[in-house]
Structure formats: structure tokens, C-alpha cells
């Protein structure tokens, strides 16, 4: 057997020492709940890694493009990158670690113990989502630099728009990562209290950095116009829309083969 099980009440000390699992209540039904919790722990770790890596890919892509294509100035300054990694990355990642158990987690087949974390399209998903976040940040920078701002304040406004877009993208993106396949509206937008708190704390702190004059000096930000705010919010919410559409397409592809398998036996009987 892969796992040795011993009874915690009636079992001997020898069997408890030799066993991999000890049932403290002598109830085999406890194993089901233990497996469920174990799968949830693994899934939540995977979600946190997904979130952190995809966000970091977005940050790296932004700086990489600015370096390779010789931008006049960097879209983000060092203190802003530190802020992103210490505040807006960490709080949602911690909240993903306590995500409630997803519906249907026990319907999945057992996972191979030697399976890589990056199988099943996981690496591709976090890569394209990270690229999307990076491109949206660059779009905000170019709009602020060349379209929306006055020439004298172009770079400061572009830097602020890029910083705000990247931060809000990451905060909104945390909600996308809560489920690999289920819609955010199906699992409940506010069903994880820890995520709600992380989002509100991160949003409040980011608004302070963008709007409070002493913090604006520290983080090299400037006040944004209503139009610039509207553009930032539209870009920041884009990952939610795109990821929800991708999930819907993935669910549709899964349902079609399942329906075909159900219809095939009926056709065979005829």
C-alpha cells in the first residue's frame, strides 16, 4: 500500500509508529475529508505561485522592453518596483493560500506524485497572463507619454499611469487566479474574506501613494486627471474580462466531449 493507516483509539503504539496516517477518531470517513483538505492545500499553493509568477512576468516584461527598446526613461522607478513586490504582490498571494475548497475537487482523479507543477498548460497560462499584464502596463505608459498628458508633464504622468495600471492589474488579477476553470461569479466574488481584506488594504494603500502629496514625492507620482483614471481602470480590469472569457472557452471545450460520450452508447444500441 502507498499509505499505511492506523487507528488512533484502538490501535497499538507499534502500528501508530509504523503508519503514515493515524485516524484519531477511528473513523475511515475522516480519510475523505483529509484527502479533500490535502488537495485544497496543494491547489492553493499552486494558485499563489501562479499569481506571483504571472505578476512578476508582467513587471519583468515592462522593464525588459524599456531596456531593449531604449525608452527615454524607465516606466517604473526602483521604489515603485519595491512597493509592488512588498505590498501588492504579497497580500493577495497570502489570501490565495486560504482559498476555500473548490466545488468538485473530489471528482478529480488522483494526482501523480512525481508530476511537475507546470504540467497541464499551467506554464502557458501564467506566461500569457503575465505578458498581458506587461503589455497593458506599457500601453498605459505610452498613452500617458504621447496621448493624454501635456508635453511638460508627459513622463511624470506616464510613469504614474504605468505604476497605477500595473498595481491595479495585479490586485484584480488575484481574483482571476482563485479558480483555474470556474467562473469568478460562480465561486462568488466575495466568498474568500481574506482576499476581500487583501484587496481593500492593497487598494487603500495604492490610492494613498497616488493621491497623498507627501507619498507622491516618495514614489514619484503625480495627480491624474479623470480621463487618465478612466484609462487606468479600463486597462486594469482587462485581465479579469480576458481570463473569464478564456475560462468560458475552456469549459465549453470540456463539455462537448463529455456530451459526445453520453450520446455514443445510445447510438451504438441502435
Language model segments and positions:
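C-terminal transmembrane module of polytopic membrane proteins
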Residues: 97, 164-270
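Membrane-embedded transport module
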Residues: 8-182
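Acidic, divalent-metal-coordinating active-site segment for phosphoryl/phosphodiester hydrolysis
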Residues: 1
Amino acid at each position: 500500500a502507498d499509505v499505511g493507516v492506523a487507528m488512533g483509539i484502538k490501535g497499538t503504539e507499534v502500528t501508530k509508529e509504523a503508519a503514515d496516517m493515524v485516524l484519531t477518531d477511528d473513523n475511515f470517513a475522516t480519510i475523505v475529508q483529509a484527502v479533500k483538505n490535502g488537495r485544497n492545500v496543494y491547489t492553493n499553493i499552486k494558485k499563489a505561485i501562479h499569481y506571483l509568477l504571472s505578476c512578476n512576468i508582467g513587471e519583468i516584461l515592462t522593464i525588459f522592453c524599456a531596456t531593449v527598446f531604449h525608452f527615454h526613461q524607465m516606466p517604473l522607478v526602483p521604489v515603485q518596483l519595491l512597493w509592488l513586490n512588498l505590498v501588492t504582490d504579497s497580500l493577495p498571494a497570502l489570501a490565495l493560500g486560504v482559498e476555500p475548497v473548490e466545488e468538485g475537487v473530489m471528482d478529480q482523479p488522483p494526482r501523480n506524485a512525481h508530476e511537475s507543477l507546470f504540467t497541464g498548460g499551467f506554464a502557458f497560462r501564467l506566461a500569457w497572463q503575465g505578458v498581458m499584464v506587461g503589455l497593458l502596463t506599457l500601453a498605459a505608459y505610452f498613452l500617458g507619454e504621447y496621448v493624454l498628458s501635456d508635453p511638460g508633464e508627459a513622463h511624470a504622468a506616464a510613469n504614474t499611469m504605468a505604476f497605477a495600471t500595473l498595481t491595479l492589474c495585479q490586485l484584480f488579477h488575484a481574483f482571476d487566479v482563485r479558480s483555474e476553470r470556474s467562473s469568478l461569479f460562480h465561486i462568488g466574488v466575495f466568498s474568500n474574506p481574506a482576499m476581500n481584506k487583501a484587496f481593500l488594504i492593497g487598494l487603500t494603500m495604492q490610492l494613498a501613494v497616488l493621491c497623498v502629496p507627501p507619498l507622491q514625492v516618495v514614489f514619484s507620482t503625480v495627480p491624474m486627471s479623470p480621463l487618465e483614471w478612466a484609462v487606468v481602470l479600463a486597462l486594469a480590469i482587462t485581465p479579469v474580462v480576458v481570463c473569464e472569457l478564456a475560462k468560458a472557452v475552456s469549459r465549453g471545450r470540456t463539455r462537448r466531449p463529455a456530451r459526445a460520450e453520453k450520446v455514443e452508447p445510445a447510438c451504438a444500441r441502435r
